[in-house]
Amino acid sequence: MANPLYQKHIISINDLSRDELNLVLATAAKLKANPQPELLKHKVIASCFFEASTRTRLSFETSMHRLGASVVGFSDSANTSLGKKGETLADTISVISTYVDAIVMRHPQEGAARLATEFSGNVPVLNAGDGSNQHPTQTLLDLFTIQETQGRLDNLHIAMVGDLKYGRTVHSLTQALAKFDGNRFYFIAPDALAMPQYILDMLDEKGIAWSLHSSIEEVMAEVDILYMTRVQKERLDPSEYANVKAQFVLRASDLHNAKTNMKVLHPLPRVDEIATDVDKTPHAWYFQQAGNGIFARQALLALVLNRDLVL
């Protein structure tokens, strides 16, 4: 039977049902346990990064290579026809889609990835981040990591800390975890960077418990996952950035009453929000989390590009 993600655009985490999320995670686990270096041997994938990226771009391109795909693309739109000659995004995508089997795209403008789907024909577009909107593949690796460390994706207590306004990772992750049962959220952020109201309204509509807090200490003993984020300098004016960047910092001493299996996650890069002394604790799991990006992205590529995937 054809898998439901074959040739599907993946723009928002809301494009995936709970069953489809579980399919991606199960596929990721299989690929982690049993690599498939020729699964995409005859596929060509475009890696189109209109915005700076290190982890996401390298993770995606490594995933492509490890599945045997050929990779074309760019990491700096300033050197493309779009950047130098004023070509529209629509024309850029229309042309690239004639060359490749799938397009992985990051863009600073919210909605750009969805717009790209209107011009890619039958070529699926995978959103690698569009402005402060969505980052669905980061969410998949987050879910994979949570499932690996906690053994489940339901009945969890999850705290999210820092920039919850502009941090697209926390928007996507909250929406994804809301598809599972019994989860409870704690949001810890300065007023200027609070979780958007539409996310809180979504949780209310689903009857999911959440609360706002002013310090990590208030919730440390309760949580299974502590999801830290950096204050995004590139999305704030200098005076606002200076006021909030040091407001929430996690140190090893803050973990004294944490649950034994509580894990600290972070989408990276970090700045000062996690002290380096946390790295040596058993709670630190952000580097393993980043490594899981390979398997989550391999799984998504494999499913989107294979009608009948059997592993």
UniProtKB/Swiss-Prot annotation:
GO terms for biological process: 'de novo' pyrimidine nucleobase biosynthetic process; 'de novo' UMP biosynthetic process; amino acid metabolic process. GO terms for cellular component: cytosol. Signal peptide: none annotated. L-aspartate binds at residues 85, 168, 230. It catalyses: carbamoyl phosphate + L-aspartate = N-carbamoyl-L-aspartate + phosphate + H(+). Keywords: Pyrimidine biosynthesis, Transferase. InterPro entries: Asp/Orn_carbamoyltranf_P-bd, Asp/Orn_carbamoylTrfase, Asp/Orn_carbamoylTrfase_sf, Asp_carbamoyltransf, Asp_carbamoyltransf_Asp/Orn-bd. One of its GO terms (molecular function) is aspartate carbamoyltransferase activity. Belongs to the aspartate/ornithine carbamoyltransferase superfamily. ATCase family. Catalyzes the condensation of carbamoyl phosphate and aspartate to form carbamoyl aspartate and inorganic phosphate, the committed step in the de novo pyrimidine nucleotide biosynthesis pathway. PANTHER family: ASPARTATE CARBAMOYLTRANSFERASE, ORNITHINE CARBAMOYLTRANSFERASE, MITOCHONDRIAL. Heterododecamer (2C3:3R2) of six catalytic PyrB chains organized as two trimers (C3), and six regulatory PyrI chains organized as three dimers (R2). This is Aspartate carbamoyltransferase catalytic subunit.
